[in-house]
């Protein structure tokens, strides 16, 4: 078992007063203040450990595709049977149903690429696609995910019944660009922006 692959992207700091050790800044930034355990989901013991933790948990967050959740008994039905008040939250690339539900998704593919954001950010007909900032789509989708979880947690506390929420990189990206997409659908206006020198305000 190796755990999260992001742990392995390390480098030495350039600050003189820092100790001579490797920093995995991407993992540290996103996981500061958290405690981690490594679980083998290929074993019954590992799945049993997750089920044991879920008995007293309020929230279960998962980024596995729906078919893999079922394979490892981590789907909504399996976990709500263990803890009927649990909030089961799923974040995927393209959602849990529809023709793309089986497809893995990443920040640059599902959020920026398939949503059309890359193309929409080009300037003019011959514009260059800008580089996406690292994890910008991941972090934006994480905010939507946390808002859904908090709302579901509140409802679970009030009703005494477990809740299921989900979001995806693709759906969140579409929402961030909804004004341009709406304009395209209703007025047939181009989604792509004009070049900066053609605008009254280059900002």
Predicted regions and their residues:
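Short aromatic-enriched loop/helix-cap "lid" or pocket-rim segments at secondary-structure transitions
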Residues: 6-10, 100-103, 176-181
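Short, ordered coil/turn segments that flank beta-strands lining enzyme active or ligand-binding pockets
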Residues: 1, 32, 158
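A structured beta-alpha segment of the ubiquitous adenosine-cofactor-binding alpha/beta core
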Residues: 19-81
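Conserved beta-strand scaffold positions in the cores of enzyme catalytic domains, especially
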Residues: 36-38, 88, 164-166
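Acidic, glycine-rich segments within the central catalytic cores of soluble metabolic enzymes
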Residues: 14-18, 97, 109, 113-203
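N-terminal Rossmann-like NAD(P) cofactor-binding subdomain of oxidoreductases
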Residues: 43, 60-121
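Glycine-rich phosphate/diphosphate-binding loop of Rossmann-like nucleotide-binding domains
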Residues: 1-28
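Alpha-helical scaffold segments in soluble metabolic enzymes
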Residues: 8, 52, 148-152
